[in-house]
């Protein structure tokens, strides 16, 4: 599923450039992705759109609060992912409403705890879905696969 999300980011400048879901599914299948992964990715993207709509009110709230994670969130996300989300927020890359969307989409992931590389992809897709300006250094960090670097 995450390979498909990166593929979409690399091949479509904005979410509006993506074709309708049925056409996109056919294109992804033609690109060699498995149907189960395509269904998972499209479902995840649908959830992203729903969550974004729900967070519109949150965007109006002042961002002076402090985020406390529940035990369930901590178990699903893990300390490395929570630390990275906090880093993005403190660096001004991820405002509070987008942070909540990242957390929601990470909790929708079947992986537990969600690896740091997956959190980076989730954050990238949330920023992409909002057509946010992404600094080149931030983009490089979000697309960096630490797991691949650790292999000798």
Curated annotation (Swiss-Prot):
Database matches in Pfam families = DUF494
Q: Looking at the record's lineage, which domain of life comes first?
A: Bacteria
Question: Can you tell me which residues the record assigns to a coiled coil?
Answer: none
Q: Describe the family membership recorded for this protein in Swiss-Prot or TrEMBL.
A: Belongs to the Smg family.
- What name does this protein carry? Protein Smg homolog
